[in-house]
Swiss-Prot record:
SUPFAM superfamilies: P-loop containing nucleoside triphosphate hydrolases, TrmE connector domain. GTP binds at residues 226-231, 245-251, 270-273, 335-338. Residues 216-378 form the TrmE-type G domain. It comes from Ectopseudomonas mendocina (strain ymp). Pfam families: MMR_HSR1, MnmE_helical, TrmE_N. Belongs to the TRAFAC class TrmE-Era-EngA-EngB-Septin-like GTPase superfamily. TrmE GTPase family. It is found in: Cytoplasm. This is tRNA modification GTPase MnmE.
Length: 455
């Protein structure tokens, strides 16, 4: 559908000086603005070189003008692009001329919002535009481009279609009880439901990797006092971010460093040494450390390799801890290899435990750790397999997963087809929030307001 509305204008290029600057216009007055500024009729989708005029035929600049009649444009509306010189004064003069002729200044993200409202792209694709602009690594940029091209949306639509087909079957059985379809006896519903859950789990895992590449991975360095945690933080940061002494308990609070590995963002957190203590200040530091561990994407459990310790990371956590992190997101760091004489190695056991021997002091093995962290973020994905995702996408996928699990329990434990049908509907609605099929105005406002002006 085409949303007839006022005409908007904005500078579409980054602030500052450059060789080229672009003013973008969208809305029903775009054609009139083109005629007034260029003083001639523009052939659609052709680049026209010439002066850009202000009042009283006073030239403001010269460059290329391109007119895109709707609906075959980015926003689905009539669009005008004026590509002139990239000086801020010149661009401001050109933008002010557009406003004098009836346009208004666009809000941040309003061009992309109109493209979404006019069905030119869905919400996940619109967000991918911002992700592509803000990408901090080559792989993050590739993933954002694939999302912009619809790869993530395609996966979500496939899940939604499977849910719709399952809902049709379940609701038909409920509406026509004379058919006497036994949900459990024929096995069709459970089989289809488990298939959707498996597909959803795959998409959720890949979306999680995409979110890490976009937002960065939170890595928490944990362990007992004097294991070398702060030395490891300093080695990764490349500077003296934390105080290092031989006194146990030097670090009493969490320290955060934001670093990049080959352009990939990492949020590294150093924590207080984990031990049962009567010192009130140190106990607060331990509590904050445990909170950080629970929120981490990856935990580096640092142990002193010169001390006789067990090799199982789960057994290495202090006995007083009531809850310990999932071993699947823990890397055991056997530090001080320069003192113990251990070889610098990265090993993965049969049960999936990852152990890395290194020396934070000498930096031996540090490159192995960097490569390992990159792999945890999905750096080794092929260009054909990744897509960009955001935290809100993960929340929606998790919601859908919970609804499907709840619906399965309702069916298998109670034989409640009506309750299953409602859970299927809610799961479909959760998926729809990703692409914008089900989205409140408040959600749309928050998303598009985070965009650049002119996008």
């Amino acid at each position: 559908m085409n949303h007839a509305r006022d005409t908007i204008a904005a500078v579409a290029t980054a602030q500052g000086r450059g060789g080229v600057g672009i003013v973008r216009v969208s809305g029903p007055l775009s054609g009139q603005l083109a005629q007034a500024i260029c003083r001639r009729e523009l052939k659609p989708r052709f680049a026209h070189h010439g002066p850009f005029y202000g009042e009283q035929e006073l030239p403001l600049d010269e460059g290329l003008a391109i007119y895109f009649p709707g609906p075959n444009s980015f926003t689905g509306e009539d669009v005008l692009e004026l590509q002139g010189h990239g000086g801020p004064v010149v661009l401001d003069l050109l933008l002010r001329r557009c406003l004098e002729l009836g346009a208004r200044l666009a809000r941040p993200g309003e061009f992309s919002e109109r493209a979404f409202l006019n069905d030119k792209l869905d919400l996940a694709q619109a967000e991918a535009i911002a992700d592509l602009i803000e990408a901090s690594s080559e792989q993050a940029a590739r993933n954002a481009l694939r999302s912009l091209q619809g790869e993530f949306s395609k996966r979500v639509h496939a899940l939604t279609e499977s849910l719709i087909q399952l809902r049709i079957y379940v609701e038909a059985a409920i509406d026509f009880p004379e058919e006497e379809i036994d949900f459990l006896a024929d096995g069709h519903v459970l089989s289809q439901l488990d298939g959707v859950r498996a597909d959803l789990s795959t998409v959720l895992r890949e979306a999680g990797q995409g979110a890490l590449l976009r937002d960065g991975m939170t890595v928490v360095i944990a362990g007992r006092p004097n294991a070398g945690k702060s030395s490891l933080l300093n080695a990764l940061a490349g500077r003296e971010a934390a105080i290092v002494t031989d006194i146990a308990g030097t670090t009493r609070d969490v320290l955060r460093e934001h670093i990049h590995i080959d352009g990939m963002p990492l949020h590294v957190v150093d924590t207080a040494g984990l031990r049962d203590t009567d010192d009130q200040v140190e106990r607060i530091g331990v509590e904050r450390a445990l909170k950080a561990i629970g929120e981490a994407d990856r935990v580096l459990l640092v142990v002193d390799s010169t001390a006789p310790e067990a090799a199982d990371p789960f057994a290495l956590w202090p006995e007083f801890l009531e809850q310990r992190p999932d071993p699947a997101r823990v890397t055991l760091i056997r530090n001080k290899a320069d003192l113990s004489g251990e070889a610098v190695t990265l090993q993965t056991s049969a049960d999936g435990h990852v152990t890395l021997s290194l020396s934070a002091k000498s930096a031996d093995g540090l490159e192995l750790l960097r490569e390992h962290l990159k792999a945890c973020m999905g750096y080794q994905q092929t260009a054909e397999s990744g897509f960009s995702a955001r935290r809100r996408h993960l929340e929606a996928l998790h919601q859908a997963e919970q609804y499907l699990e709840h619906g399965r329990n309702q069916l298998t434990l109670m034989g409640a087809g009506e309750l299953l049908a409602e859970d299927l509907r809610m799961a479909q609605q959760a998926l729809g929030e990703i692409t914008g099929a089900f989205s409140s105005d408040d959600l749309l406002g928050r998303i598009f307001s985070s965009f650049c002006i002119g996008k």
